[in-house]
């Protein structure tokens, strides 16, 4: 995998800039994280202090290894839209070790294809620059919006890979997750 490779921390798509986190991202990230619709399939809804601490951990990971959950900025407006990127999950998942792709966008940006656009660029970095052989994604069973993004990215559901997420309490409606996978495209 990509321990010593330092890809560019910032890269662009036609409408987005994926970059290192800045202090100006903290307030809009906290607002995104406090939105019950955004957090519908995630636990728990964080406090402002929790949100700031998460942003600091993400920023430190990018600073240390060159990649992670990049802040997503809308190029035309300059606004923070959310985050997208790659991560090695800390939880002991049944399919670990792995690299996951994930995203979270403010509701203002939903329905415009931005999550797919940003995630497609992150996958490209993961495969072409970092050399990962496979990237996974997972979500609670009921999160059909994220599952649809995974499918638009060309990811396929691992029908034998459904699992109970260890960070979600037993008996909670969000505990059961579906698993998607995508392999590095083969050339020629």
Show where each model-derived region lies.
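Acyl-donor (CoA/ACP) binding surface of acyl/acetyltransferases
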Residues: 1-41, 73-188
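Conserved GNAT-fold acetyl-CoA-binding loop/helix
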Residues: 37-59, 68-70
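Glycine-centered flexibility motif
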Residues: 66-68, 85
């Amino acid at each position: 995998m990509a321990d010593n490779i330092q890809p560019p921390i910032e890269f662009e798509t036609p409408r987005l800039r994926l970059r290192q986190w800045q202090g100006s991202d903290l307030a809009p990230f906290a607002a995104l994280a406090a939105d019950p619709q955004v957090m519908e399939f995630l636990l728990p809804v964080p406090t402002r202090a929790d949100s700031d601490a998460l942003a600091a951990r993400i920023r430190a990971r990018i600073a240390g290894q060159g990649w992670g959950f990049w802040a997503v900025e809308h190029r035309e407006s300059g606004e923070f839209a959310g985050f997208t990127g790659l991560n090695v999950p800390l939880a002991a998942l049944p399919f670990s070790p792995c690299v996951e792709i994930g995203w979270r966008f403010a509701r203002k940006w939903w329905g415009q294809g931005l999550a797919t656009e940003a995630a497609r660029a992150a996958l490209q970095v993961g495969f072409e620059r970092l050399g990962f052989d496979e990237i996974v994604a997972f979500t609670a069973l009921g999160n059909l919006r994220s599952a649809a993004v995974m499918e638009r990215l060309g990811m396929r559901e691992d029908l034998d890979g459904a699992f109970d997420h260890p960070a979600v309490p037993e008996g909670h409606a969000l505990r059961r997750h579906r698993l998607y996978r995508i392999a590095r495209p083969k050339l020629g």
